[in-house]
């Protein structure tokens, strides 16, 4: 009997003890749920039959050009066009709209919201584009 016990002990020594798992030390008192697998959604049908058209296209972004005396001075001296723009338009959308509608590159755009609640944009054109020619082409000179 003792020989059988000795053989069993020898086997366990050779295999090693694998049944003790070291516990992870928790350093925080808050339990953070582990990240689990999130499968991509596969809807059975579309929730909207037709996607909504763009709310701000180029024609909505630029409302109209401003041709006041100060705007004319900007055109002549600073190579800058002045526009009324949609209140929710930002500088990036204004730049893209000017490029698409008038096919000129804008270098810089300054915007301000006027006291009457409309937004005004000062579009500085690149050196190769002449603001006077663009204004003539648009038709507000």
From Swiss-Prot:
Subunit structure, interactors included: Component of the large ribosomal subunit (LSU). Mature yeast ribosomes consist of a small (40S) and a large (60S) subunit. The 40S small subunit contains 1 molecule of ribosomal RNA (18S rRNA) and at least 33 different proteins. The large 60S subunit contains 3 rRNA molecules (25S, 5.8S and 5S rRNA) and at least 46 different proteins. uL23 is associated with the polypeptide exit tunnel.
GO MF terms, alphabetically ordered: rRNA binding; structural constituent of ribosome
Remaining remarks: There are 2 genes for uL23 in S.pombe.
GO terms of biological process kind: cytoplasmic translation; cytosolic large ribosomal subunit assembly
Protein's job: This protein binds to a specific region on the 26S rRNA. Component of the ribosome, a large ribonucleoprotein complex responsible for the synthesis of proteins in the cell. The small ribosomal subunit (SSU) binds messenger RNAs (mRNAs) and translates the encoded message by selecting cognate aminoacyl-transfer RNA (tRNA) molecules. The large subunit (LSU) contains the ribosomal catalytic site termed the peptidyl transferase center (PTC), which catalyzes the formation of peptide bonds, thereby polymerizing the amino acids delivered by tRNAs into a polypeptide chain.
Pfam families named among the record's database cross-references: Ribosomal_L23 (PF00276), Ribosomal_L23eN (PF03939)
Protein name as it appears in the record: Large ribosomal subunit protein uL23B
InterPro entries listed in its UniProt record: Nucleotide-bd_a/b_plait_sf, Ribosomal_uL23-like, Ribosomal_uL23/eL15/eS24_sf, Ribosomal_uL23_CS, Ribosomal_uL23_N
Family: Belongs to the universal ribosomal protein uL23 family.
Annotated TM spans: none
Subcellular location: Cytoplasm
UniProt region (Disordered), positions on chain: 1-22
Lineage, broadest ranks: Eukaryota, Fungi, Dikarya, Ascomycota, Taphrinomycotina
GO cellular component: cytoplasm; cytosolic large ribosomal subunit
């Amino acid at each position: 009997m003792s020989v059988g016990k000795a053989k069993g002990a020898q086997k366990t020594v050779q295999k090693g003890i694998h049944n003790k798992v070291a516990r992870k030390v928790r350093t925080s008192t808050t339990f953070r749920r582990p990240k689990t697998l999130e499968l991509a959604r596969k809807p059975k049908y579309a929730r909207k039959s037709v996607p909504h058209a763009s709310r701000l296209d180029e024609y909505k972004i630029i409302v109209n050009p401003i041709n006041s005396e100060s705007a004319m001075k900007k055109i002549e001296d600073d190579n800058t066009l002045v526009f009324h723009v949609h209140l929710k338009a930002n500088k990036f959308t204004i730049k893209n709209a000017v490029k698409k509608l008038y096919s000129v590159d804008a270098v810089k755009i300054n915007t301000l919201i006027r006291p009457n609640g409309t937004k005004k944009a000062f579009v500085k054109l690149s050196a190769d584009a002449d603001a006077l020619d663009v204004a003539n082409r648009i038709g507000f000179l």
